[in-house]
Swiss-Prot record:
Encoding gene per record: CD209
The name this protein goes by in its record: CD209 antigen
Keyword Metal-binding appears in the UniProt entry: yes
GO CC terms in record: external side of plasma membrane
Superkingdom of source: Eukaryota
Additional note from the record: In vitro, is a receptor for HIV-1, HIV-2 and SIV and transmits viruses to permissive T-cells.
């Protein structure tokens, strides 16, 4: 840096000398003109001396200022060069960074496309073949559903009371299940599946699984048809037998709606939700029934058993709302004296305005009518023949006596 400053200083010195020489030349000419005008006298000499001294002082005073300006210009040029160098350096680094970024981007794209195309193609072809193979498989789901429906039908028929018939029906249904599972024609399988579904629904609606003999005979005929198939090809015979079996089931008597229980010519509904006593009356009326009114000891034992099995507090249609201490059924009939034995020990006690009767444990209890409890509805059953009615009616069971 010092080497570059010395030539600059020399140039500045020469420039100052030229400026001084030019000024002296111009001043000399002025002096001569003045002397020519005024003549050669002492006054002229003094004036000339004074003028020369003043000019010299002015020029000397200018020299440091010029040197200072030159130094400032050099510093400014140096600073500009330094900034330019830094800018060029940063520009170079940024261009390198940009180039590296672009290369990395291209490399990333290239690497992303590198997975083994041959392996991918092989996997794709294998998946395609597997998809086609699975698509050609027979409808296993339908066969499985047929199997499940037959299993449920077997369980439903297996609940019939006559154990000897039940075992034979169970075995025949097991063989039928295996035979139908092997049938090849899908269209016939679909028809069989639909018929079995309808048959399942029909059998499921039977209140007490009646007409065992007729079902047993139809299953025997169906077994003979299945056993006589040489190559499992006579599916039409199986189909016809199923149609006949379905018709036989549909002819069976349905004295009570689904989810109602048949007993001695009446149907009973045990609720799964809870209401107060008045709302329970309304709920029974909405289904064409009434809150249960007990007419016999057998009916009482049957209902008490149903309630105690579920361990529920259940409303009956009995209260003393009209007259305290006078218990009356919702149909207006009074409570018979012989029925008072069904009250639990110490009941009814009318503690806190307890005016409605409920099944509680192994007997009856009075409680507040506004409490929510389960309830039992009762209505007459549909007409069936005497034989069927005997099959539908379970034998009454006497509940355990209340604890002492």
């Amino acid at each position: 840096m010092s080497d570059s400053k010395e030539p600059r200083l020399q140039q500045l010195d020469l420039l100052e000398e030229e400026q001084l020489g030019g000024v002296g030349f111009r001043q000399t000419r002025g002096y001569k003109s003045l002397a020519g005008c005024l003549g050669h006298g002492p006054l002229v000499l003094q004036l000339l001396s004074f003028t020369l001294l003043a000019g010299l002082l002015v020029q000397v005073s200018k020299v440091p200022s010029s040197l200072s300006q030159g130094q400032s210009k050099q510093d400014a040029i140096y600073q500009n060069l330094t900034q330019l160098k830094v800018a060029v350096s940063e520009l170079s680094e940024k261009s390198k960074q940009q180039e590296i970024y672009q290369e990395l981007t291209r490399l990333k794209a290239a690497v992303g496309e590198l997975p083994e195309k041959s392996k991918q193609q092989e996997i794709y072809e294998e998946l395609t073949r597997l998809k086609a193979a699975v698509g050609e498989l027979p409808e296993k789901s339908k066969l499985q559903e047929i199997y499940q429906e037959l299993t449920r039908l077997k369980a439903a028929v297996g609940e019939l009371p006559e154990k000897s018939k039940m075992q034979e029906i169970y075995q025949e249904l097991s063989r039928l299940k295996a035979a139908v599972g092997d049938l090849p024609e899908k269209s016939k399988q679909q028809e069989i599946y639909q018929e079995l579904s309808r048959l399942k629904a029909a059998v499921g609606d039977l209140p007490e699984k009646s007409k065992q003999q007729e079902i047993y005979q139809k299953l025997t005929q169906l077994k003979a048809a299945v056993d006589g198939l040489p190559d499992r090809s006579k599916q039409q015979e199986i189909y016809q037998e199923l149609i006949q079996l379905k018709a036989a089931v549909e002819r069976l008597c349905h004295p009570c709606p689904w989810e109602w229980t048949f007993f001695q010519g009446n149907c009973y509904f045990m609720s799964n939700s809870q209401r107060n006593w008045h709302d329970s009356i309304t709920a029974c009326q909405e289904v064409g029934a009434q809150l249960v009114v007990i007419k016999s000891a057998e009916e009482q034992n049957f209902l008490q058993l149903q309630s105690s099995r579920s361990n529920r507090f259940t409303w009956m249609g009995l209260s003393d709302l009209n007259h305290e201490g006078t218990w009356q059924w919702v149909d207006g009939s009074p409570l018979l004296p012989s029925f008072k034995q069904y009250w639990n020990k110490g009941e009814p006690n009318n503690i806190g305005e307890e005016d409605c009767a409920e099944f509680s444990g192994n007997g009856w209890n009075d409680d507040k009518c506004n409490l929510a409890k389960f309830w039992i509805c009762k209505k007459s059953a549909a007409s069936c023949s005497g034989d069927e009615e005997r099959l539908l009616s379970p034998a009454p069971t006497t509940p355990n006596p209340p604890p002492a």
